[in-house]
From Swiss-Prot:
One Pfam family matching this protein: Arf
SUPFAM superfamilies: P-loop containing nucleoside triphosphate hydrolases
Its EC number(s): 3.6.5.-
Predominant localisation class: membrane
Keywords for the protein's UniProt record, in alphabetical order: Cytoplasmic vesicle, Endoplasmic reticulum, ER-Golgi transport, Golgi apparatus, GTP-binding, Hydrolase, Membrane, Nucleotide-binding, Protein transport, Transport
Phylogenetic classification of the source organism: Eukaryota, Fungi, Dikarya, Ascomycota, Saccharomycotina
Cell compartments where the protein resides: Cytoplasmic vesicle, COPII-coated vesicle membrane; Endoplasmic reticulum membrane; Golgi apparatus membrane
The organism of origin for this protein: Eremothecium gossypii (strain ATCC 10895 / CBS 109.51 / FGSC 9923 / NRRL Y-1056)
GO cellular component, one term: endoplasmic reticulum membrane
The name this protein goes by in its record: Small COPII coat GTPase SAR1
Protein function: Small GTPase component of the coat protein complex II (COPII) which promotes the formation of transport vesicles from the endoplasmic reticulum (ER). The coat has two main functions, the physical deformation of the endoplasmic reticulum membrane into vesicles and the selection of cargo molecules. SAR1 controls the coat assembly in a stepwise manner. Activated SAR1-GTP binds to membranes first and recruits the SEC23/24 complex. These SEC23/24-SAR1 prebudding intermediates are then collected by the SEC13/31 complex as subunits polymerize to form coated transport vesicles.
Gene Ontology biological process terms in this record: endoplasmic reticulum membrane organization; endoplasmic reticulum to Golgi vesicle-mediated transport; intracellular protein transport; membrane organization; mitochondrial fission; mitochondrial membrane organization; nuclear envelope organization; positive regulation of ER to Golgi vesicle-mediated transport
Enzyme class of the recorded protein, top EC level: hydrolase
Subunit organization: COPII is composed of at least 5 proteins: the SEC23/24 complex, the SEC13/31 complex and SAR1.
InterPro entries according to UniProt: P-loop_NTPase, Small_GTP-bd, Small_GTPase_ARF/SAR, Small_GTPase_SAR1
Amino acid sequence: MAVWDLFGWFRDILSSLGLWNKHGKLLFLGLDNAGKTTLLHMLKNDRLATLQPTWHPTSEELAIGSIKFTTFDLGGHIQARRLWKDYFPEVNGIVFLVDAADSERFNEARVELDALFQIPELKTVPFVILGNKIDAPSAVSETELRAALGLLNTTGDARIEGQRPVELFMCSVVMKSGYLEAFQWLSQYI
């Protein structure tokens, strides 16, 4: 029995230092055509694929560093958004993608994001917002996207007791840039 206690103590120490394998449940959310499925395929297979809109939720197992994630890619069209709530129980993080090149839909994205922030079930769940498609000529700057989404005061690397961790990262899934930093940031809260 004492050996198991010692093992548990050692595991707890390693876990507190972030050195033990962790497992998390992530939801990939955002409006349709933001790049959720493309990102998931890039993380899983390290390549782009020609994809159709996501009509049905899909699940994948991913490993990023020492953390294993069960990811759920939920469609972003209006009908699919009604199903998002079914996946909230036991979620450890939300990855919310926004098409940074589609400024006409920023308000719609902000409404959905604000609605998610108001859900009591998610009050302590960390959110990483990815401003995707920064390689597109019409993409806005990080400052413009933060203003459009009402994310001028995010938590960054600070851990503030009682405050949900939220951070915005700009990325281009097709250019393979920006999103790994976002997952590294998110992993510290899982």
